[in-house]
């Protein structure tokens, strides 16, 4: 299923996932500003909490991506809708961990965007699966 953007906010989010899936963390910087917030809605696992500004990349994404083979995980967008500055995405991610385990997880994302940047994003996933896969349970 191919998802196409209905507006510029949706296109920004699709572009974000394309770059995120590439593993090019430096290229992700163009999507954020100093007050951007990425909040995984999880508890008691690595990455929990709010990540702000370029710490999103330096202190959150870089360590998380380091748990996977280079270029993984990949995000596959299944559905997307938006209202005003909000974009909601249903997706799944696939990849391989550094120790060869297969990663497959379902996600829902809520983005708030303005002026061509991500102001805030909330990430929902099966955190129990993630904790178990990485031995955090």
Regions found by a protein language model. Give the residues of each.
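A beta-strand edge to alpha-helix "cap/lid" segment located at domain peripheries
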Residues: 2-5, 61-137
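A solvent-exposed, acidic/Ser-Thr-rich amphipathic alpha-helical stretch
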Residues: 30-80
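Short, mixed-charge, low-aromatic patches
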Residues: 12-22, 47-50, 65-68, 90
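Residue-level detector of alpha-helix boundaries and kinks
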Residues: 1, 13, 42-45, 96
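Hydrophobic pocket/interface hotspot
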Residues: 13-16, 28-29, 36, 53, ...
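Short charge-dense sequence patches
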Residues: 5-18, 38-42, 57-63, 81-84, ...
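Short, low-complexity N-terminal intrinsically disordered segments enriched in polar/charged residues
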Residues: 1-34, 133-136
